[in-house]
Regions:
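Acidic donor-binding loop of glycosyltransferase active sites
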Residues: 285-302, 314
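Conserved donor-binding/catalytic core segment of Leloir-type glycosyltransferases
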Residues: 212-229, 235-238
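Nucleotide-activated donor-binding/catalytic signature segment of Leloir-type glycosyltransferases, i.e.
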Residues: 261-284
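A short, active-site helix/loop in glycosyltransferases that binds the activated sugar's phosphate group
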Residues: 168-193
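Conserved acidic donor-binding segment of nucleotide-sugar-dependent glycosyltransferases
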Residues: 273, 330-331, 335-342, 349-356
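A short, well-ordered alpha-helix in the C-terminal region of glycosyltransferases
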Residues: 217, 247, 344, 351, ...
């Protein structure tokens, strides 16, 4: 299974949505001497996402060396071998467009002709991507969401997921809390499931933070606005917080369409809504300036938001859904409150804001203890064991 000198040839195919956890993993695998070729799919709807901030889409469909068409990738040259990074560029955003269907056929052939040891995917194949199943023994799938989020379900996506879980022999879950329920619900044999974790989102440390101007202390929600994230509960909780701590602001930063009437909240002088893509430098500035972060999710798996915040030493108030209560240790690195409970969320925010000694102790614990456990070397080793497993 190995190439010369026990080096593996790994093709890693992903999307910008996972760049903040893909980049450090791929960099670590490359540093270990493996031939890792990273392919990232970019379209109009994904060109500004997590670490990727591409202002203008290259106007042709095809497979290209990343730096040939997007100079923005040069920002990551210090921790990725950019000569091994390629863009799967989609001029047309419709996945059923004939040009995109043909591109996926070309991509599968392109991968197979390289004769890799492993083809690592981060999303279940759909449409003509299902040709990947011709090489099913080489496939590894990272299952970022063992269960689909509320509001994100559709029959085609679920059908594609079920096919992937049936056909792909190695499936990596990023927390242990949901593995039994996942295996039972999707009828996945235990020996097909490998447990790993997210590490420190170290890429944000390489970016110069843009100072965030605020004349009041503030707490921060950041990320894409989608229904499962429970922003409406946070806004209602903030009304109660404001009655006791009128100086405290809430900043909600992220693109996406609001799924409830946001207009009444825009009128509140203690709520600042920034409804657009937030670049990494801008986010770093917000995180360095905030009191702490909040994840009021209604349901979840694990969350890259927590990894990003902790990388910069920022404690979190989170709800007890998915594996968030595993990622955040209650009273140690943050607080865990009940989901969809305005009172409990408000009480958690007020408790942490009012206790500066506790908040500072959490910051210290994150910097001195959490980071010890979140290096990518051991995570990369776990992936290699998965790849090598017969």
């Amino acid at each position: 299974m190995f190439n010369d000198q026990c080096s593996m040839k790994i093709i890693y195919y992903s999307s910008p949505f996972y760049a903040d956890c893909d980049f450090p993993l791929i960099g670590e695998l490359q540093r270990k001497g493996h031939d890792v070729r990273y392919y990232i799919s970019i379209a109009s709807f994904s060109k500004r996402s997590t670490l990727i901030d591409i202002k203008e889409l290259y106007p042709h469909t095809g497979i290209y060396p990343a730096t040939k068409i997007y100079q923005e990738f040069n920002e990551f040259r210090n921790f990725l071998d950019l000569s091994q990074v390629y863009v799967v560029n989609q001029k047309y955003k419709q996945k059923f467009h004939p040009v995109n269907l043909l591109l996926m056929v070309r991509l599968v052939i392109h991968f197979l002709m390289q004769k890799p040891d492993v083809i690592h995917l981060t999303k279940a194949p759909c449409l003509t991507q299902k040709l990947f199943y011709l090489a099913r023994k080489k496939l590894v799938l990272t299952v970022h969401d063992p269960f689909l989020h509320s509001g994100a379900t559709n029959k085609m996506t679920e059908r594609d997921r079920r096919m992937a879980f049936k056909k792909i022999p190695k499936q990596v879950l990023l927390n242990n809390r949901q593995s039994s329920a996942f295996a039972s619900y999707y009828h996945v044999p235990d020996n097909h499931i490998f447990i790993n974790k997210l590490g420190m989102y170290s890429s944000i440390l390489y970016v110069d933070p843009l100072p965030f101007q605020s004349d009041r202390p503030f707490i921060l929600f950041f990320g894409q606005i989608v229904e499962y994230k429970g922003v409406e509960y946070l806004l209602e909780a903030m009304k109660r917080v404001h009655s006791r701590y009128p100086e405290l602001m809430l900043v909600i930063a992220g693109g996406g369409k609001y799924y409830f009437d946001i207009e009444p909240y825009k009128k509140l002088d203690y709520v600042k809504i920034i409804n657009r893509y937030i670049g990494t430098g801008e986010l770093a500035g917000m995180l360095r300036a905030c009191e702490f972060g909040v994840c009021p999710y209604k349901d979840a798996t694990q969350s890259g938001v927590i990894q990003t915040a902790f990388t910069l030493g920022v404690p979190m108030v989170v709800t007890n859904v998915g594996a968030l209560a595993v990622a955040v240790q209650h009273n140690i690195t943050g607080l865990v409150v009940n989901p969809c409970d305005v009172n409990d969320l408000a009480n958690g925010i007020m408790e942490l804001y009012s206790n500066k000694e506790k908040l500072n102790a959490m910051r210290t614990h994150i910097k001195e203890e959490w980071k010890k456990d979140m290096g990518w070397e051991s995570i990369a080793d776990s992936y290699l064991k998965c790849y090598e497993n017969p």
